[in-house]
Amino acid sequence: SRQTYEEYFARIKSGDPSKLVVIIDEAQFVAKRDASFMEAVAKLKKHKLYPGPVLIILATSSTVWATQEAAEQFKGAEMKLESLNFLEVVRHFESLPVAEIVRIYGAIGGVPAYLDKWDAAKSFKDNICRLVLTPSGALYGEADAVISAELRELSAYSTILAAIARGENKLNDIFHATGFSRAKISVYLKNLAAFNIVEKVVSFETGGWENAKKGVYQIKDTFVNFWFKFVYPNMSNLYLLSPEEFYDTYIEKELDAYLER
């Protein structure tokens, strides 16, 4: 018969009798699939399934689940882990020249899970072709996954992000580029900002203080920005060309200018 979560937690043994540490990664998937999971976690926390002290770590990539659903069911400390900054990425790739790390950081950012997939023994081009431009690559569908993990209407959000990535970064520009109503765009941008995908910044390049106050939008998530700048607008050709041909045609020539932004 199928073992319940309560039975499973009750069978856990600790190598150190002073404390049991239970770490569950991407816990939101289990919780959404089976309501009894969080009930069992609560019982474990209250020492009903294990006699000694217990430290429970529920890791998740879902902001909504962490701040709303989990917070309602599970009272405890919260910690948001930020991406690595540039200096931390330099230390991660200590064998590589800084110029190469600038390229890596400019393409995939400081997300540890992305960096762990990067093969420092291979060139920047080889890694992008292998991870990003190959359908079986680890980061091929990652930009869509980042968006759809928290938001519906992937197509609409993708249209807006593609507009911003090509420089249509003011509300009026996005309106003309997408054909969506200004009200709809404002709601979508607010949602994207809530999940740290897009941010609004003040820019004096727009001319005058009044325009500066209105600000411009830019994609905050480094890899999402890279994807919508280079890959998404040319997806039809990605199906026709080899990853190497696609890289040479659509990425290589504009990469340095992109990294200087």
Name the predicted role of every residue range.
Residues 15-16, 48, 96, 167:
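Short coil/turn helix-boundary motifs
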Residues 29-33, 37, 41-71:
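Sensor-1/coupling segment of RecA-like P-loop NTPase cores
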Residues 1, 49-52, 94-100:
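Short, polar/flexible loop-turn hinges at active-site or ligand-entry regions and domain interfaces
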Residues 120, 125-261:
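Accessory nucleic acid-recognition modules appended to NTPase machines
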Residues 17, 51, 73-76:
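Short, well-ordered coil/turn elements that cap or connect secondary structure elements
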Residues 1-15:
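Short glycine-rich substrate-engagement loop in P-loop NTPases that contacts/grips substrate
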Residues 12-37:
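Conserved P-loop NTPase "ATPase switch" module shared by AAA+ and STAND
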